[in-house]
Amino acid sequence: MSTREIPLLLDGPCGPLEALYLDLPDARGLALLCHPNPVQGGTMLNKVVSTLQRTARDAGYSTLRFNYRGVGQSAGSHDMAGGEVDDAEAIVLWLRAQQPQLPLSVLGFSYGGFVAAALAGRLEAQGQVVE
C-alpha cells in the first residue's frame, strides 16, 4: 500500500488551493483535514495535522489536507470570516467526485476545528452526511 501523498492544486473560490491527497485502495472513508490559524503560522504541514493524517491513513481512510486561501501556494487572502469554510467546501466537492461512495469525515485542529465544525454544519444543512 502506498502511503505517499500527492501534491495537488485544486479549484477554490479564490483560485487554486494547495493540497496533499492520499488515495488508499479499498479505503473505508474520506478524511478532510483542516489546519490551525494561518495568522499564527498554521499550515497543512502543522505537526498535529500531520499526526491526524497518519492516524486517519492507518485507520484506512483516504486523506486530503489543504492550505486555506492565502497560505502556501493557495491563492487569495486569509479572512477568518467564512472564506476558509468556503475553501473547505470546494475541497469536499472535489473529494466526493473522486470517491462518491465513501463516507466523509472532517477533522481539524484549533482554528481548523472551527472550520471543520462549520463545514459539517453547512453540509448537513444541505442534506449531506458527515461522520
Question: What are the residue ranges of the model-derived segments?
Answer:
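Residue in the alpha/beta-hydrolase core beta-strand immediately N-terminal to the catalytic nucleophile
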Residues: 103-105, 131
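A conserved short beta-strand
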Residues: 125-131
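Glycine-rich "HGGG/HGxG" loop immediately N-terminal to the catalytic nucleophile
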Residues: 69-80
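Gly/Ala-rich beta-loop-alpha elbow adjacent to hydrolase catalytic centers
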Residues: 108-116
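Alpha/beta-hydrolase active-site loop
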Residues: 78-98
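N-terminal cap/lid segment of alpha/beta-hydrolase-fold proteins
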Residues: 1-26
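Active-site signature of alpha/beta-hydrolase-fold catalytic machinery across serine-
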Residues: 118-122
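Short, surface-exposed "cap/lid" segments of acyl-processing enzymes
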Residues: 14-16, 24-65
